[in-house]
């Protein structure tokens, strides 16, 4: 490796909004990173993920426009 072209790699403390902290290594010189979510509070990792129901949108679309298109096709 060439000397002098690589950034310094320092021990870093990551602090989450939920209060969880952990140690990692980073090129950020301050040695401190603040994040909003981490693996301890993110819904995907905690199992509290909300699954969106897109079927309701499709049914609503068909109720609005599907019936009109069906009437036009039947009228011909």
From Swiss-Prot:
Belongs to the bacterial ribosomal protein bL31 family. Type A subfamily. This is Large ribosomal subunit protein bL31. GO terms for biological process: translation. Binds the 23S rRNA. SUPFAM superfamilies: L28p-like. Zn(2+) binds at residues 16, 18, 38, 41. Binds 1 zinc ion per subunit. InterPro entries: Ribosomal_bL28/bL31-like_sf, Ribosomal_bL31, Ribosomal_bL31_A, Ribosomal_bL31_sf. GO terms for molecular function: metal ion binding; rRNA binding; structural constituent of ribosome. The lineage of its organism: Bacteria, Bacillati, Actinomycetota, Actinomycetes, Mycobacteriales. Its cofactor is Zn(2+). It holds the Pfam family Ribosomal_L31. GO terms for cellular component: ribonucleoprotein complex; ribosome. Gene3D superfamilies: Ribosomal protein L31 (4.10.830.30). Part of the 50S ribosomal subunit. Keywords: Metal-binding, Ribonucleoprotein, Ribosomal protein, RNA-binding, rRNA-binding, Zinc.
């Amino acid at each position: 490796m060439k000397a002098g072209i690589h950034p310094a790699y320092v021990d870093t403390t990551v602090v989450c909004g939920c209060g969880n902290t952990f140690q990692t290594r980073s090129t950020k010189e301050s040695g401190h990173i603040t994040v909003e979510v981490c693996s301890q509070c993110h819904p995907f990792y905690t199992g509290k993920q909300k699954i969106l129901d897109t079927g309701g949108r499709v049914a609503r679309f068909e109720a609005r426009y599907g019936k009109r298109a069906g009437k036009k096709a039947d009228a011909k």
